[in-house]
Amino acid sequence: MARKRGGSSKKQKKVSFDYGVVHIKSTFNNTIITLTDKDGNTLTWASGGTVGFEGTRKGTPYAAQLAADKVAREALRMGIKKVDVLVKGPGPGREPAIRTLQGAGLEINQIKDVTPIPFNGCRPKKRRRV
């Protein structure tokens, strides 16, 4: 079998920003955290699944905390110090993710809730009866 040549397979992005935008999409099943530049180009991302959780554990606050820590470490490595945070969704990972970003050393300029709310749009699914 042929040996693999060259370095690691993961590309290292050469970025020299000092400002970024963190998008936190928090659902009841998972939390996805994406770091972008101000134009919206993705620099790095993490979720409950990428930090090692499976199934229902992806939606826990602890999984969101670990994902946020991973993104924050990568942002600091790239030289990003200041971020805006855009939060979308009602999940349990919203608050722990923001707290972890702050605790990791990122300076948060603003926190904005961008959860889409319909102005009487489509008919919702039927109510869940337990």
From Swiss-Prot:
One of its GO terms (molecular function) is rRNA binding. The gene is rpsK. Keywords: Ribonucleoprotein, Ribosomal protein, RNA-binding, rRNA-binding. PANTHER family: 40S RIBOSOMAL PROTEIN S14/30S RIBOSOMAL PROTEIN S11. This is Small ribosomal subunit protein uS11. It comes from the Bacteria. Belongs to the universal ribosomal protein uS11 family. Part of the 30S ribosomal subunit. Interacts with proteins S7 and S18. Binds to IF-3. Located on the platform of the 30S subunit, it bridges several disparate RNA helices of the 16S rRNA. Forms part of the Shine-Dalgarno cleft in the 70S ribosome. InterPro entries: Ribosomal_uS11, Ribosomal_uS11_bac-type, Ribosomal_uS11_CS, Ribosomal_uS11_sf. GO terms for cellular component: cytosolic small ribosomal subunit. GO terms for biological process: translation. PROSITE patterns: RIBOSOMAL_S11 (PS00054).
